[in-house]
Design a protein with these regions (language model features):
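Conserved C-terminal active-site "lid" loop/helix of NAD(P)H-dependent oxidoreductases
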Residues: 153-157, 179-205
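Active-site "gating" loop of Rossmann-like NAD(P)-dependent oxidoreductase/epimerase domains
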Residues: 33-59
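Glycine/proline-rich active-site loop of Rossmann-fold NAD(P)-dependent oxidoreductases
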Residues: 63, 75-77, 88-97, 132-142
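Glycine-rich "substrate-gating" loop/helix at the edge of Rossmann-like oxidoreductase active sites
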Residues: 52-58, 85-91, 112-122
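Conserved beta-loop-beta element that borders a ligand/cofactor-binding pocket
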Residues: 34-35, 67-90
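NAD(P)-cofactor binding segment of oxidoreductase domains
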Residues: 1-30
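Alpha-helical substrate-binding/gating segment
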Residues: 70, 99-107, 115-150
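Mid/C-terminal beta-alpha module of Rossmann-like enzyme folds, strongest
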Residues: 135-182, 216-240
Length: 240
């Protein structure tokens, strides 16, 4: 699994850089994916873009991925390394998997619930990518995370409130470690308190700076979509 994760990211980025080197007319900017896993597990202090690489597999993966992308700088291409937090949206990712569990009233914090979660609403992520592409002041590492990280417990409570469901059943650490091994600590049980210092410095304004705002919007959109999708069925039943 680890070899696949490293190989896929380095191979695709390397192939892209090889292609860019052959072009006579190159793009002005390359925005390369990365993740806040670069910083390792550390929720004891705030993390900005100047913090050094952490320890662990995720940190190694992100560092190697970023190093490959930085080859674009030698080609005269402005390079932005987007260190993305947990992306929240209603059409995929972790939240889409959690929604049915929380809707059934079976949700709760992961582990002890104290680990910090650095997150970003999907719409804000898209807007930040557009801003970074358009503004030449963006270069190097860029934390793509909302300015208000929360604990796993706070996240669970906010999601429960958005769904009008209880969120008091914790997901124990043991089964996660049995399923994922030591990756469980890096991906789910460990935390990071990442702040978007560069984005704010360059004038970017988040539409969803707080977890309650983000989850209320996402849940509302999900409910509206579900209502629209069931309307033809209801109307057909009424006609018969």
């Amino acid at each position: 699994r680890r070899a696949l994760l490293i190989g896929s990211r380095l191979a695709v980025t390397g192939a892209l850089l090889t292609l860019l080197a052959r072009l006579d007319h190159r793009p002005d900017v390359l925005i390369s994916g990365s993740a806040i896993g670069f910083y390792g597990i550390d929720d004891s202090s705030a993390i900005d873009e100047g913090v050094a690489r952490g320890r662990g597999f995720a940190a190694e993966l992100c560092a190697r991925w970023e190093a490959e992308a930085r080859r674009a700088e030698a080609l005269g291409i402005r390079t932005v390394l987007l260190r993305t937090g947990l992306v929240l949206g209603n059409s995929g990712g972790m939240l889409a998997s959690l929604l049915p569990i929380f809707e059934a009233g079976l949700g709760g914090p992961v582990g002890k619930g104290r680990q910090m979660m650095s997150w970003i609403h999907r719409d804000d992520l898209v807007r930040l990518i557009v801003a970074a592409a358009a503004d030449g002041e963006f270069t190097g590492a860029l934390n793509a995370a909302a300015p208000n990280p929360v604990s796993s417990r706070t996240f669970a409570m906010a999601l429960g409130q958005a769904l009008h469901r209880p969120a008091i059943l914790p997901l124990p650490a043991l089964p996660l470690r049995l399923m994922l091994g030591d990756l469980a600590d890096e991906l789910l049980l460990g935390g990071q308190k990442v702040l978007p210092v560069k984005a704010i410095f360059h004038g970017f304004r988040f539409r969803y700076p707080r977890i309650e705002q983000a989850l209320d919007e996402i849940v509302g959109r999900t409910v509206k979509r579900a209502a629209i999708s069931t309307r033809p069925f209801v109307e057909a039943r009424l006609l018969h």
